[in-house]
Amino acid sequence: MSLKQRYRETIQPKLLKDLSLSNIHEVPKVLKITVNRGLGEAAQNAKSLEASITELATITGQKVVVTRAKKAIAGFKIRQGMPIGCAVTLRGERMYAFLERLINLALPRIRDFRGVSPKSFDGRGNYTLGVREQLIFPEISFDKIDAIRGMDITIVTSARTDEEGQSLLREMGMPFRSN
């Protein structure tokens, strides 16, 4: 059963009851997932940007957008318009497929993994998680990478509070660490 189907058939009715909501449309849901990678070295090394674009496209299965510097910062040796990172926004079927792969395949492959921090919510039910290395994703093989780079994964939900967002992600299988 896919994550989307499981959400519709079991998670949604359970959250409706647990959060004591009156309408099925009030139940929190995942709206989008953004995968972002900031590359400071992209200003000097164009190959690192190309490698990152290829890796993110392989991991997410979607075209990557290059993020550029909004203004020049002499201390970082960047000019306005220089590429400094890349990002992908996932919605719909690809979003659910990515979330399922993240929870079931990627997170358990992290070394010394005891669960993700429950403190990484932003106050509005959205969850951000930093990944230190791209090798946790099964699509990336060790031979093909030039350097170990991390990424930020933000899960945007329609939850109004952190508690609602956490209960949604917990029901979906996100392994939160118990502090």
Swiss-Prot record:
Keyword hit for Metal-binding: no
Role according to the record: This is one of the proteins that bind and probably mediate the attachment of the 5S RNA into the large ribosomal subunit, where it forms part of the central protuberance. In the 70S ribosome it contacts protein S13 of the 30S subunit (bridge B1b), connecting the 2 subunits; this bridge is implicated in subunit movement. Contacts the P site tRNA; the 5S rRNA and some of its associated proteins might help stabilize positioning of ribosome-bound tRNAs.
GO molecular function: rRNA binding; structural constituent of ribosome; tRNA binding
InterPro entries (UniProt xref): Ribosomal_uL5 (IPR002132), Ribosomal_uL5_bac-type (IPR020930), Ribosomal_uL5_C (IPR031309), Ribosomal_uL5_CS (IPR020929), Ribosomal_uL5_dom_sf (IPR022803), Ribosomal_uL5_N (IPR031310)
Protein name: Large ribosomal subunit protein uL5
Annotated Gene Ontology cellular component terms: ribonucleoprotein complex; ribosome
Oligomer status and interactors: Part of the 50S ribosomal subunit; part of the 5S rRNA/L5/L18/L25 subcomplex. Contacts the 5S rRNA and the P site tRNA. Forms a bridge to the 30S subunit in the 70S ribosome.
Keywords in alphabetical order: Ribonucleoprotein, Ribosomal protein, RNA-binding, rRNA-binding, tRNA-binding
SUPFAM superfamilies documented for this protein: RL5-like (SSF55282)
Similarity comment: Belongs to the universal ribosomal protein uL5 family.
GO biological process, one term: translation
